[in-house]
Amino acid sequence: VNGAAYAGLCAYMFLLILVGFPVNFLTLYVTLEHKKLRTPLNYILLNLAVADLFMVLGGFTTTMYTSAHGYFVLGRLGCNVEGFFATLGGEIALWSLVVLAVERWIVVCKPISNFRFTEEHAIMGLGFNWVMASACAVPPLVGWSRYIPEGMQCSCGINYYTRSEGFNNESLVMKMLICHFLIPLFVIFFCYGRMLCAVKEAAAAQQESETTQRAEREVSRMVVIMVISFLVCWLPYASVAWYIFCNQGSEFGPVFMTLPAFFAKSASIYNPLIYICMNKHSRHCMI
């Protein structure tokens, strides 16, 4: 790999930091500054911003530094730290999206009568979020698989590449695929799918008034953007990781894993734009 590729990665990470930090920090600041935004639902949105800041400060800065050097210069400890923060931040963000999807489904579709999303429910959602994220990020630190430099050796991730006797890589990869990708994806599709159906049913029952038509358009737009952003960010990375895992021993170019891994990092920019900037109250407070 020539030096221009590493320079490109370094510039890309700098761009993510340049955009990701202020957008997520502004999200935190505005929500904490304005009392009307401190609602139970926004606790989850704040958690999303915290997760993105974890990725920016704990992962992106390290990756930019190592990209500038052309390899991972920070040793085993640095690899563990970078891999942990990147994985934890990504998983917190992912499970925040799941909690948001479940909350929206319960509120809009009303499968539980007279349910009101309270501060206690939000705290429970945050606790569940951190438990699931930690269940993914901590095992490689304690011997269940491990974090290793991947792709162009500028960032670290869980070892999909080898079986590594004694580290049980296979079981962790299967756990990650099922528990930390397929199940969240199913939940998100289910919740927003049911939400869209509920809006359509309400529109039909009310003979499609202007209000319900507008609500349907807003929900549809939110569903499409949410699903596309999730798939765009994570499906390439998950697919390539699974392909490499299923073809261990084969030769793969360093760019093969680098591109989807670095592309997935762009989720730190998409999240606040979708879940905060599309909220008119948050947007007005920011202005």
Curated annotation (Swiss-Prot):
Q: Where are the transmembrane segments?
A: 6-30, 43-65, 80-102, 122-142, 172-193, 222-243, 256-277
Sequence motif: 'Ionic lock' involved in activated form stabilization, positions: 103-105
PANTHER family annotated for this entry? Answer: OPSIN
Q: State one Pfam family annotation.
A: 7tm_1
Residues with attached carbohydrate: N169
Q: Which ranges make up the Extracellular topological domains here?
A: 1-5, 66-79, 143-171, 244-255
Q: Please state what the protein is called.
A: Rhodopsin
